[in-house]
Each structure stands twice: as C-alpha cells, then as structure tokens.
Amino acid sequence: MKTWQELTITVHRDAEEAVSNMLIEAGSQGVAISDSADYLGQPDRFGEIFPDVTQDDMITITGYFPESFAITEVTASLEKQVATLKSTGLETGPVSIASHELEEEDWAENWKKYYEPARITHDLTIVPSWTDYDAKPEEKVIKLDPGMAFGTGTHPTTKMSLFALEQVLRGGETVIDVGTGSGVLSIASSLLGAKEIYAYDLDDVAVRVAQENIDLNANTENIHVAAGDLLKGVTIQADVIVANILADILIHLTDDAYRLVKDEGYLIMSGIISEKWPMVRASAEKAGFFLETHMIQGEWNACVFKKTDDMSGVIGG
C-alpha cells in the first residue's frame, strides 16, 4: 500500500488561511483543519461586531505529502515561512510542527473526521455531504463536499460573509459571487431567496468543485458558475456582490463592483486582515460606496458597503 507523509502545524486560528496556502504551495495534496471553536458573534443589524470568543485560539492544520517528498526540508522551509507571518499582522501563537507516515487508505479519509455539521448563522447550517443530518424546521442546510484543498465554510471570513448575506438578502435579488471557491456563498444566497446567482473563480478546479457542491443541494438551478478573473467582462447588474478573497485583490475589485451594483445595492467583502482594513475601506469609499456594517473576528475583518444617496444608515467614522 502507498505511504504518505502527514505534516501537522499547530498555529493560531488567525493564520489558518495563510498556513493552509503554504502547505498547498509546498506540495501538499490537500489540507485538513482541526478547529475546536465553532463560533460567530451575535451582533446588531448594523455597526461594529466584536464576537465573544472564549475557546482555544490554537488550531491544527495538516498537510499530506507523497512519500517521495523530502519532508525534513519541507518542514524547515515551512518553519521559516510561518515565522514571517507576524510581520504581516497575523497572530501565530506558539507554533509547533510535526510529521509522520500514513497509509494511503487512512490519508484519503483522515481529513473528513474533522468536518462536522456546523450551525454558522441564525438560519444557515453547513453539513458534510456524507453525513445524515436531522435539520430543525428553521434551519437552511448547505451540503458541502469541498475536498481537502477547499474550505469547509467554518473559517471566520466565510462565517462573516454568510452572516452579511443573511442580513441583506430579502428575496428576489441577483447576486454575484467573486472567487466562489467551494460555492458555499452562492448556495447560501440561493437558500436565502436570491433569484439568480452568478459565481466566478479564476481557478478551474474551484469552478468544478463549486458546481459539484451546487449539485448536492436542491433547487440550485439558479446558480450559474463560470471561470472568470474578478469582474472583468461582467455586465450583469446585481443587487449584491460578495467577495471573500485577499485584501490586496479586493482593492482591484471595487470600481467594477460599483459599476455593476444597482442603486441601493450592496458590496460584501471579507478576507481582510486588520492592518489591510483601512486600505480596503478607502478603496470602496473612493469608488462611491458607503460603509454600512463592519465585522471583526480576531484579526479578520468583513464589511457591507452600500451604493446609496441616503446617508442615514451608514457609519460615519
């Protein structure tokens, strides 16, 4: 039986996305995340959100490498990369890295044991596609099989995006999902009553995975997935545009978003570390948007901007 090498990094949850990307770039065939916390603050409709997080802030991120990889060299390289994260504003905590061998049969299923049904917002629950789940009447269930290289929908940036969608969608809207990844935000938009959803991702693998996840969920024929580079070439007028991607990419999105968002429509952005938040806010406001909601979880920020002439609901400072 083929043997794989499992490399496990224990790190602060703020560094989850960065470390996961490091593992993939180093050659990992996927990542599994063990996170004891499943939290989302319960904020007011508008304004600042500061969730009360009392659980352990350390998580375990595991990568899976072929037997042929020089795991000692990979480990040394990752140690150096993780050590640089603090200079970017991310908390890493007391980092530890360990590795051991794993049989292929165990590797293929190992990541799934960390993925359990999770109530993300008041209405939305994410459930692994292989799990039987008895939903409560008020729950809207999103079925996902993201694969090891895609998020399971429980990262703070995704949670805040889902919360924002739950707040702004009232039914009948057109939504554009930029950088759809696993497709979770598009599926949520459909469940929350959006009429048409257009999901784009530059990565062909993400486009395929998103479509597979969409097909797992009933009544999602209104979701249209395609390869695309942000909003380039898009002409659809949307009530809501949502983008959970890196801050340095978001700032290149705001002008096109303003062009495509209808009057009184919304731009939801997430994936923003705190030190990048002023830059993203300035970009959106320069494009013509007004800040309506600002959400914070740890070092991560998300926001809802509105295209409006009515200043009564916006945040002034």
Curated annotation (Swiss-Prot):
What is the similarity comment for this entry? Belongs to the methyltransferase superfamily. PrmA family.
Catalyzed reactions: L-lysyl-[protein] + 3 S-adenosyl-L-methionine = N(6),N(6),N(6)-trimethyl-L-lysyl-[protein] + 3 S-adenosyl-L-homocysteine + 3 H(+)
Q: What is its EC number?
A: 2.1.1.-
This protein's GO cellular component annotations are:
cytoplasm
Q: Where, by residue number, does S-adenosyl-L-methionine bind?
A: T158, G179, D201, N244
Q: In the UniProt record, what gene is named as encoding this protein?
A: prmA
Tell me the PANTHER family matching this sequence. Answer: ELECTRON TRANSFER FLAVOPROTEIN BETA SUBUNIT LYSINE METHYLTRANSFERASE (PTHR43648:SF1)
**NCBIfam families, per this entry?**
prmA
Q: What is this protein called?
A: Ribosomal protein L11 methyltransferase
Task: Name the enzyme's class.
Answer: transferase
Tree of life domain: Bacteria
Give the organism the record lists: Streptococcus uberis (strain ATCC BAA-854 / 0140J)
